[in-house]
Structures are given as C-alpha cells and as structure tokens.
C-alpha cells in the first residue's frame, strides 16, 4: 500500500523558526518559536541574531512537532524570499534531513505559501481561478494574479517600504515594542478617522509607495511629542493610530479594486502577517467577490503554510 503523504514544512525566512507537518492535506503540527523578544531589544530584526536563533531552534521545533521521521514522505522549506542568512540555515537543515531520510526536497516560495495559507482548513474545491493573491506582511506588499497552483504573476508591488515594515517603524516612534502591529491594530476606532488627517499616497495601481506616509507619521509624532504637557505614558494615540491605519490600508484596497477591474478575477486570497489586521480583513470582505483569508494562527510566518503549499503542488501534479 502506498504511504500517505506526510510533508515536513520548514520556515526560517525572518525572525520566526517554524516547523509544520501536513498529513493527507491536514495540519498535524504547527510549531512556531519566535525570537521577537530578542529583536525587541534593538527595535527590529537583526539578521545575524535571527540566523543564530534559527540554528538554536530548528531541532527543538522539530522535536516539539512530534513527527515520526520514518513517516515523512517529503521535506519542504522556504527557499525565497527572505533574509539570506536565515534562508541558508533553513535550507541547510532541510537538505541534511533530506539526505539522512532519503526523501525528496521541495524549495517553496514563501510568498506563494502565504497566499495559499488562506486555503488551510478549507475545501480546496472552493478555489476559483483566475484569482488575486493579496500578500501584506512585514517584508512584502504585493498583488499576484493566480492562474494556477503553479503559475502566479506579480502584478503590483511596493517600490519602497512594505506595510508591515511601516507599522513597526511608526509603532517604534510612538514608543511601542517590536512588533508594533498588534498594538496599533488594537487602537483602531473608525469613528476617529478623518479624510484629511494625512495626505494619501498617490501611485499607479501597479506600485505601492509608503515612504511618504511614513515621513508624515514621523513628523506628526514629533509635533505631538513637542506639545506642552505631552506624557508618552498617558497620551491617547487612538486618533493618530486610527488615521494611520485607515490611510495605509485604504491605499492598498484601492489598488486591489483597480486590479479587480483590470483582471476580472473570480475570487480573492489574502495572507501574510498584516492579514491579521481587523480593518484589512473587514475591507477585503466588502470587495463584492468571493474571498478566503488566512486563519489568524497561520498569518505570521509558519512551517504549516510551507508544507501545505507543497502538498497542493504535489497533489496538483498527480491529478
């Protein structure tokens, strides 16, 4: 009898070390060991520190997954994009396991895995093509045209900062620890949003640009801090945070609307760390197209999505 698929997914693109195990298209293990506390000390990810953390945590994560090595049929790892040193650690670990277990090795595009994480715990038959793949994370802001599981075309990307990167830098200027996204998200109040609080970024729909908005935020924060009686411990950041988030998310959504008009997709898939943002998730649901959004526990970098996308590719080739 043929051995059932059991795919080990390895994720080391940035600051999270993760192992996922996919058995017969279902997530059997989802282990994430984060080094965020280390990076909070410097206000952001230090590549060398992240790479060393992966070296220390990969075997630990594998052991915590509980996977029986003899049951593994394939080994998938995040091959690109990501921090070079971190990618090297993950690739070396994957190649070593592949050699020791004599199992096939699958290099996986980290961003494609984010997109298709929206299908985890869903019926794969819900996927209608062509679709738009929306990636919003700390390192990337992009829109893909999904023609098949194997054919994704990049149709829009950031020319400077990614949305998640701006969140972290603005949050740091406000005095929040890394990562700042969840704190900013918690401050959002739609009734505080004003149409002219910030100048809105203006770019062609195929390009995102957030460096100008980031500069506006730094200027506004500086002005707030210079006000008489300002106390960073008690200051109410809700209005600032609400307008920042509305501006940056609305800009992304407007580009998505343009992409919908241009390419006429049948549905939307949303993934990436910032896809955990409540306002972004809400805006995607209002785009009048069928949609799938990554479950919250799979929005950050994780090995489960690496293994899951590998599983889709293997089954897609066999069918």
Swiss-Prot record:
Q: Which InterPro entries match?
A: ATPase_NBD, Gcp-like_dom, KAE1/TsaD, Peptidase_M22_CS, TsaD
Q: Which UniProt keywords apply?
A: Acyltransferase, Cytoplasm, Iron, Metal-binding, Transferase, tRNA processing
Which residues participate in substrate binding? 135-139, 168, 181, 185, 277
Q: Which PROSITE patterns match?
A: GLYCOPROTEASE
Q: How is the cofactor bound?
A: Binds 1 Fe(2+) ion per subunit.
Report the GO molecular function annotations. Answer: iron ion binding; N(6)-L-threonylcarbamoyladenine synthase activity
Q: Which cofactor does it need?
A: Fe(2+)
Source domain of life: Bacteria
Q: Which GO terms describe its cellular component?
A: cytoplasm
According to its UniProt record, the EC number is 2.3.1.234
**Reactions catalysed according to its record:** L-threonylcarbamoyladenylate + adenosine(37) in tRNA = N(6)-L-threonylcarbamoyladenosine(37) in tRNA + AMP + H(+)
Q: Which residues bind Fe cation?
A: 110, 114, 301
Disulfide connectivity for this sequence is: none
Q: Name one GO biological process term.
A: tRNA threonylcarbamoyladenosine modification
Subcellular localization: Cytoplasm
Family to which this protein belongs: Belongs to the KAE1 / TsaD family.
> Which PANTHER family does this chain map to?
TRNA N6-ADENOSINE THREONYLCARBAMOYLTRANSFERASE, TRNA N6-ADENOSINE THREONYLCARBAMOYLTRANSFERASE, MITOCHONDRIAL
Function as written in the Swiss-Prot or TrEMBL entry: Required for the formation of a threonylcarbamoyl group on adenosine at position 37 (t(6)A37) in tRNAs that read codons beginning with adenine. Is involved in the transfer of the threonylcarbamoyl moiety of threonylcarbamoyl-AMP (TC-AMP) to the N6 group of A37, together with TsaE and TsaB. TsaD likely plays a direct catalytic role in this reaction.
Could you tell me which NCBIfam families the record lists for this protein?
gcp_kae1, T6A_TsaD_YgjD
| HAMAP family xrefs | TsaD (MF_01445)
Q: What is this protein called?
A: tRNA N6-adenosine threonylcarbamoyltransferase
Q: Which organism is it from?
A: Mycoplasma pneumoniae (strain ATCC 29342 / M129 / Subtype 1) (Mycoplasmoides pneumoniae)
């Amino acid at each position: 009898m043929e051995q059932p698929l059991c795919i080990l997914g390895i994720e080391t693109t940035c600051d999270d070390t993760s192992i996922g195990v996919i058995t017969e298209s279902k997530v059997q293990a989802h282990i994430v060991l984060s080094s965020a506390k280390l990076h909070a000390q410097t206000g952001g990810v230090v590549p060398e520190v992240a790479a060393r953390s992966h070296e220390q945590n990969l075997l630990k994560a594998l052991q915590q997954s509980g996977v029986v090595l003899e049951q593994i049929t394939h080994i998938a790892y995040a091959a690109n994009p990501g921090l070079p040193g971190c990618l090297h650690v993950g690739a070396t670990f994957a190649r070593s396991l592949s050699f020791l277990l004599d199992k096939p090795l699958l290099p996986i595009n980290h961003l494609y895995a984010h997109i298709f994480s929206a299908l985890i715990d869903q019926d794969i038959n819900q996927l209608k093509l062509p679709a738009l793949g929306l990636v919003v994370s700390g390192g990337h802001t992009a829109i893909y045209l999904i023609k098949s599981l194997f054919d994704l075309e990049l149709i829009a990307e950031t020319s400077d900062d990614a949305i998640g990167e701006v969140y972290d830098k603005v949050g740091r200027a406000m005095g929040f620890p890394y990562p700042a996204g969840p704190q900013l998200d918690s401050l959002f109040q739609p009734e505080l949003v004003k149409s002219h609080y910030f100048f809105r970024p203006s770019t062609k729909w195929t390009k995102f640009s957030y460096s100008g908005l980031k500069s506006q935020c730094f200027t506004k924060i500086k002005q707030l801090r210079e006000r008489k009686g300002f106390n960073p411990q008690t200051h109410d950041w809700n209005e600032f945070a609400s307008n920042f988030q509305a501006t940056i998310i609305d800009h992304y959504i407007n580009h998505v609307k343009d992409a919908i008009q241009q390419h006429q997709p049948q549905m939307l898939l949303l993934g990436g760390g910032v896809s955990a943002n409540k306002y972004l998730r809400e805006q995607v649901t209002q785009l009048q197209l069928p949609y799938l959004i990554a479950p919250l526990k799979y929005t950050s970098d994780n090995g489960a999505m690496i293994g899951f996308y590998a599983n889709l590719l293997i089954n897609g080739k066999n069918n």
